[in-house]
Amino acid sequence: MLGIDTNVLVRFLVRDDQTQFKKARKLLKREVSNGRRVFINQLVLLETEWVLRSRYGLAKTLMLDTISRLLDAPDIQLEDEPAVEEALFIWRDANADFADCLIGARNGRFGCRATVTFDTKASKLSGFTAA
């Protein structure tokens, strides 16, 4: 398995730099053709979501679709996929950020009875409590 950094994933998804896109695609194809999966940890996933939303202006619906496609890709392994799936489910109808949804999902999976926050939007999510 080969882990990838945010810039490789963003270049692969956005394709705005053809040289880097081709390098990323070649690297990913090589791994897959050798029977290996590509690993995306949650820090990379969160940073990618932030970059695509803030720098490229991708709408939430496109982000939901993009992350769902990564989850469904047989050659990609996301860190703690059940937490990512839960976060996506929550995020669909929430005003909070994806990061907050993932924080809540992860904390719940680790047995936390609640997540305390100063974030008004996040405090409205199930499993969160306002500080």
Model-flagged regions — what are they?
Residues M1, G104-A131:
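Acidic, PIN/NYN-like endoribonuclease modules and their adjacent C-terminal/linker elements
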Residues M1-I40, R55-L62, S68:
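Short, well-structured N-terminal submotif of metal-dependent ribonuclease cores
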Residues D5, N41, A96-D97, D119-T120:
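Histidine- and aromatic-rich ligand-binding microenvironments
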Residues V8, V44, A83, L102-I103, ...:
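Alpha-helix capping/helix-boundary segments
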Residues D16, Q42-V44, D65-D93:
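Acidic catalytic patch
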Residues G35-V38, D75, G111-A114:
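Short active-site oxyanion
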Residues A83-R113:
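A mid-sequence interfacial segment
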